Swiss-Prot record:
UniProt-listed InterPro entries: 4pyrrol_synth_GluAld_NH2Trfase (IPR004639), Aminotrans_3 (IPR005814), Aminotrans_3_PPA_site (IPR049704), PyrdxlP-dep_Trfase (IPR015424), PyrdxlP-dep_Trfase_major (IPR015421), PyrdxlP-dep_Trfase_small (IPR015422)
EC number: 5.4.3.8
Cofactor(s) demanded: pyridoxal 5'-phosphate
Gene Ontology biological process terms from the UniProt entry: protoporphyrinogen IX biosynthetic process
Principal location listed in the UniProt entry: cytoplasm
GO cellular component, one term: cytoplasm
Pfam families: Aminotran_3
Subcellular location: Cytoplasm
Pathway of action: Porphyrin-containing compound metabolism; protoporphyrin-IX biosynthesis; 5-aminolevulinate from L-glutamyl-tRNA(Glu): step 2/2
Biological source species: Shouchella clausii (strain KSM-K16)
Annotated positions of the N6-(pyridoxal phosphate)lysine modification: 268
GO molecular function: glutamate-1-semialdehyde 2,1-aminomutase activity; pyridoxal phosphate binding; transaminase activity
Name under which the protein is recorded: Glutamate-1-semialdehyde 2,1-aminomutase 2
Subunit note: Homodimer.
């Protein structure tokens, strides 16, 4: 494998038409030093590009495809839904059906509002938190990505915790100053924020498992401490489970860790591969959202019938037994990748949460973004390119994890481990 002639030509055609030739930056493959590969079709755990190369896929559209590509049930029900109409701008039954499933399985959610993306979900949840508490500031964690809303595109300055600085041109400093940022898993920095800014702290927003720094689980007691201190301070705790929701566990990460937030943001899996997001939580908080309350949120395509249908038939197929099988396969893949790297003297650290795995090229244990950044990016790029040539599709970024689906077979896992052994051997002998 390695013939990507048609992909190269397709990218040349796209570059003058879209910023960087893509509609989301990471897809440009800049960090791995090659042209993006254009995909054409997928089925189960496999995906095929426009040059005819087939891959075992661990990107899965960045996580949503927990049943694999083109699941038969989801596709059939989407065909039926499409024939009835693609959008109504009116209530319909599948909104209610999906809402019932979400409320049944997510411990924190009594009431849920459907939106169109994870970014919409986090932006709306923060507006709700500010409106409900009457406070302005929020606390987020370095390396935790919550979408591209202005108040969330913030990085930390110097010191334990500082007033935020914009992480992108176009974000006003006046907006950034209401966002406080500390390191993930750093309880003492969180304590400082509460002691210094507690009276105006509306919310703490956190990924219960950080998935945008390469899969970093919480340290023991971290989430529990956030829960205790937010309750004591009258601050809302928001779990961003856009990535972890229904992927880390049957009842999401909050069910696995036994920590219940005030609000939860969802996306990815609950849309079955279609654009979707949701936020929900305690009834007394959610009833502040219009039309029940004064805090405004709306969307033309929110709860559209296609996304709701795909989401409903995705979640309705998932069982508790599936998550046990996820764990078994993920443990095997984790162990196999680690053994392959060790065999060839490749420095590495590996983390796992449910069916998410993060492989870092560093000898240091990775428990926050600072440690994730010690990973050798050149080594990752070589690994990515080697695996792609071996027929394994991984995310083209060190700071994204890999995902498993119910469609991944034991043979897929073993083939992936064997490919990694060959790639690591080639890297070690250069």
């Amino acid at each position: 494998m390695g013939n990507w002639t048609k992909s190269i030509e397709a990218f040349k055609e796209a570059q003058p038409l879209m910023p960087g030739g893509v509609n989301s930056p990471v897809r440009a493959f800049k960090s791995v030093g090659m042209n993006p590969v254009y995909m054409k079709e997928g089925k189960g755990a496999k995906i095929k590009d426009i040059d005819g190369n087939e891959y075992i896929d661990y990107v899965l559209s960045w996580g949503p495809l927990i049943l694999g590509h083109a699941n038969d049930v989801v596709v059939e029900e989407l065909k039926k839904a499409t024939e009835l109409g693609t959008s109504f701008g009116a209530p319909h039954e599948y909104e209610t059906r999906l809402a019932k499933l979400v409320i049944e399985r997510v411990p924190s959610i009594d009431v849920v509002r459907m939106v169109n993306s994870g970014t919409e979900a986090t932006m709306s949840a923060l507006r709700l938190a500010r409106g409900y508490t009457g406070r302005n500031k929020i606390l987020k964690f370095v390396g935790c990505y919550h979408g591209h809303g202005d108040s969330l595109l913030i990085k930390a300055g110097s010191g334990v915790a500082t007033l935020g600085l914009p992480d992108s041109p176009g974000v006003p400093e006046s907006v950034a100053q209401n966002t406080l940022t500390v390191h993930y898993n750093d309880v003492e920095s969180v304590r400082y924020v509460f002691e210094t800014f507690g009276d105006d702290l509306a919310a703490v927003i956190v990924e219960p498992v950080a998935g945008n720094m390469g899969v970093v689980p919480p340290e023991p007691g971290f989430l529990e401490t956030l829960r205790t201190w937010t309750e004591e301070n009258g601050t809302l705790l928001i779990f961003d489970e856009v990535m972890t929701g229904f992927r880390v566990g049957y009842t999401c990460a909050q069910g696995e860790f036994g920590v219940t937030p005030d609000l939860t943001c969802l996306g990815k899996v609950i849309g079955g591969g279609l654009p979707v997001g949701a936020f929900g939580g305690k009834r007394e908080i959610m009833e502040q959202i219009a039309p029940s309350g004064p805090i405004y949120q709306a969307g033309t395509l929110s709860g559209n019938p296609l996304a709701m249908t795909a989401g409903y038939y995705t979640l309705s197929q998932l069982t508790k037994a599936d998550y046990s099988e996820f764990a078994r396969k993920a443990e095997r893949l984790e162990a196999g990748l680690s053994a392959a790297a060790k065999q060839h003297g490749i420095p590495h650290s590996i983390n796992r949460a449910g069916s998410m795995i993060g492989l870092f090229f560093t000898d240091e244990r990775v428990y926050n973004f600072e440690k994730a950044q010690t990973s050798d990016l050149d080594l990752f790029a070589a690994y990515f390119r080697g695996m792609l040539a071996e027929g394994i599709s991984l995310a083209p970024s060190q700071f994204e994890g890999l995902f498993l689906s119910t469609a991944h077979s034991n043979e897929d896992i073993e083939a992936t481990i064997a490919a990694a052994e060959r790639v690591f051997q080639a890297i070690a002998t250069k």
